[in-house]
Amino acid sequence: MEIIEGKMPFMGYETHYRIVGRRSEKSPLVLLHGGPGSTHNYFEVLDKLAKIDDRRIIMYDQLGCGNSSIPDDHPELYTKETWVKELKTLREHLALRKIHLLGQSWGGMLAIIYMCDYHPEGIQSLILSSTLSSASLWSKELHRMIKYLPIEEQAAIHRAELTDTFTEPDYLKANEHFMNQHAIDMKKKWPECVMREKKGGTVAYETAWGPNEYTPEGNLHDYEYTDQLSKIKVPTLITSGTDDLCTPYVAKTMHDHIAGSQWKLFENCSHMSFVQKTDEYIAMLKKWLDAND
């Protein structure tokens, strides 16, 4: 299977991209990773979709992580405006006139911002994977789920938030337990691309989002797009897991506000259903993409 990797000049830095599959008449699928700062790595589990569907799959490391430039000495660059500009620049650089767009977690937020604020042309369809339209609802839902943790772990998280200290061992243990339950359990064995140590991303994450998933205090703290979702007019598929950080309430909120959207809930999956049920996810994507080319 053909894989091309390259670098794109961007704002005096470089953005690393990866293209899987050969050029065909079908519109390519562009993947937006989460974080901010999580890198494209885990998306490599979707590589075989390129062969199965004869379609190019394009992924990239957003500025601040992975094989792209990591200008951590300029954290003011880590904003939604920068990352939207990077996506627009990538489309121009690779001449991506018509695409399908999939955003996972923060990548879905980026896709929503792009669709609602910039009204791009050439988007054949949108896939919102385990993402959110409201930072406040997300935080509220995650704090609800924290109440299912053991009492001592709840207390450790509460103390950390109260004192704005997120380095104590008891907090770190509690947060790890929570993320293993609802993001992905890293104690299990996953494909190499999922287990691969990522480069950078911490400064981007803490600058834009915050110290953890449930304390959004970075520059995205006021991310509130639920009431703007009606601006999305392209075919939209929402995916999430039953044990996801993106709770069914979060997913249904997006589904209810995007006319004609579809929602697929993956049983016994958390924040990465495409990793936990890869074959089922790829089959779903193939059917969706072929129907909306």
Swiss-Prot record:
Please tell me the species this chain comes from: Lactobacillus acidophilus (strain ATCC 700396 / NCK56 / N2 / NCFM)
Q: Where is the active site?
A: 105, 244, 271
* GO CC annotations on file: cell envelope; membrane
Q: Look up the signal peptide feature and give its range.
A: none
For this protein, the Enzyme Commission number is: 3.4.11.5
Q: Which GO terms describe its biological process?
A: proteolysis
What family does the database annotate?
A: Belongs to the peptidase S33 family.
Enzyme class, UniProt record, top EC level: hydrolase
Q: What is its main location?
A: other
Q: What are the disulphide bonds in this sequence?
A: none
Report the protein's function: Releases the N-terminal proline from various substrates.
Please name the GO terms that the record assigns under molecular function.
aminopeptidase activity
Protein name, please? Proline iminopeptidase
The listed locations are: Cell envelope
Q: Which UniProt keywords apply?
A: Aminopeptidase, Hydrolase, Protease
